[in-house]
Regions:
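An N-terminal-biased, well-structured beta-alpha scaffold segment characteristic
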Residues: 2-107, 111
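Glycine/serine-rich phosphate-binding loop and adjoining beta1-alpha1 elements at the start
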Residues: 2-4, 10, 80-170
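Glycine-rich phosphate/diphosphate-binding loop of Rossmann-like nucleotide-binding domains
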Residues: 8-47, 155-202
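Short linear motifs at secondary-structure transitions and domain/linker junctions
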Residues: 9-12, 47-50, 65-70, 122, ...
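Alpha-helix boundary/capping detector
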Residues: 54-55, 134-135, 174
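A broad detector of short, well-ordered amphipathic alpha-helices
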Residues: 67, 139-142, 146, 181, ...
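Residue-level detector of alpha-helix initiation sites
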Residues: 77, 139, 177-178
């Protein structure tokens, strides 16, 4: 019997991401898995139900998608109620935030589901393809600078015009991890003067 992989629509307010793309769904289908995606799961990320269907995934209601699922993929872990009908001992791969959401972790244990908290995936070469934090931190650093530029209300680069000279914005980045490095690169590309600090020595 083929492995059944389910993807539910994210329920958290303001969450527009989806745990699977049609491209990856197509790869899973090619490997012999059955992929089921809830209707509208990808709309927030501009991925249509039709795109998932073309990739070979089943598209349906939440109950139909999760029925007999062996693996459930999520950006944020769904409540156990949303997993009703999944196979006993089903694996759920998502971000769980277990230290703040201990009640949800306890509910998973009581229901008999295997919780794979993807944010704790070790940052080693072998696990690089499953490193959810790096990809999201990269985007966070990029978006942080764009948001700051929008709030700043003036131009980032130096501009010499007939009306006078506008000095380049000075951007200070605290921390040069994945997000910080992307923030530095984005601010530099926008023309700002950038400096940074980190708790680690150079």
């Amino acid at each position: 019997m083929a492995l059944r992989i389910a993807v539910l629509r994210e329920r958290a307010p303001g969450e527009s991401r989806v745990a699977l793309t049609p491209e990856t769904a197509k790869k899973f289908v090619a490997l012999g898995a059955v992929v089921a995606v809830e209707e509208g799961a990808g709309l927030g990320a501009a991925l249509t139900d039709g795109a998932f269907a073309e990739a070979g995934a089943e598209v349906g209601s939440a109950a139909a998608v999760v029925k007999d699922a062996d693996i459930v993929l999520g950006v944020q872990a769904p409540d156990t109620a949303a997993l009703a009908g999944a196979s006993p001992g089903a694996w759920v791969a998502a971000t769980f935030d277990p230290f703040r959401e201990s009640a949800r972790v306890a509910a998973y244990a009581e229901a008999g589901y295997e919780a794979l908290s993807m944010e704790f995936m070790p940052r080693i070469t072998r696990a690089q393809s499953m490193d959810v934090l790096s990809s999201q931190s990269n985007l966070a650093g990029y978006k942080a600078v764009l948001t700051a530029a929008n709030v700043y209300g003036r131009a980032f680069p130096m501009m010499m015009t007939a009306a006078g000279t506008v000095q380049a914005a000075k951007v200070f980045v605290m921390g040069v991890g994945v997000a910080g490095l992307q923030a530095i690169a984005t601010a530099k590309r926008l023309g700002a003067q950038v400096s940074a600090t980190d708790v680690r020595s150079a």
